[in-house]
Amino acid sequence: MDARILQDNDDTSLPVNQASVTRIHKKPGKAEAEAAVRTLLLWAGEDPDREGLLETPKRVAKAYQELFGGYSESPEEVLGTTFEEVAGYDDMVLVKDISFFSHCEHHMVPIIGKAHVAYLPEGRVVGLSKIARVVDIFARRLQTQESITAQIADSMQRILKPRGVAVMIEAEHMCMAMRSIRKQGSSTITTTFTGDFKEKADQQVRFMTLIRT
């Protein structure tokens, strides 16, 4: 299949675990996606023509379109509208317990967790729902937890230009719970700090204290 090369060192809307040179192939059509699901059913030992599976290829293709909808969205669009009339407020803005789901890029099984996101505004703020939307944009892609954490922080720092951003993610990985070592209930915690959150220990302490209260 022919491929074209796209180079963009500043595009954090792309997963950060991709190289700055990203190979983009022609996107398959709906029929090709459904055929791929049918092939997987056959490979698993199933009969895709039995009654219960007749519509499965269509359903899976439709579900994947929603589950991986983050590829068609960008944080620039979501964070582009800000408000400057904040009566001089310049302290921490924290949105915690943002539930999300993603999919492991290694096994394509779910990652389920919650994100805590804070920033220190520099003269302007963004709608609170926009922060949750940014989490979803990056979560609805094939990911690693480390990448999601960094992408949220990097995009907010780059677009909003605040004095700092703090992100913590707590999640359970079904690739650990459902396969291999099969350890249900274990969680992974990742953090990323920029600006004042990275340079000032007291700001990190405030962030960590607030998300635990």
UniProtKB/Swiss-Prot annotation:
KW Nucleotide-binding (keyword) present: yes
Pathway: Cofactor biosynthesis; 7,8-dihydroneopterin triphosphate biosynthesis; 7,8-dihydroneopterin triphosphate from GTP: step 1/1
GO molecular function, one term: zinc ion binding
Enzyme class label: hydrolase
Residues that span the membrane, as ranges: none
EC numbers, comma separated: 3.5.4.16
Secretion signal span: none
InterPro entries found in the cross-reference section: GTP-CH-I_C/QueF (IPR043133), GTP-CH-I_N (IPR043134), GTP_CycHdrlase_I (IPR001474), GTP_CycHdrlase_I_CS (IPR018234), GTP_CycHdrlase_I_dom (IPR020602)
Reactions mediated catalytically: GTP + H2O = 7,8-dihydroneopterin 3'-triphosphate + formate + H(+)
Quaternary structure note: Homomer.
Protein's UniProt name: GTP cyclohydrolase 1
Organism of provenance: Brucella canis (strain ATCC 23365 / NCTC 10854 / RM-666)
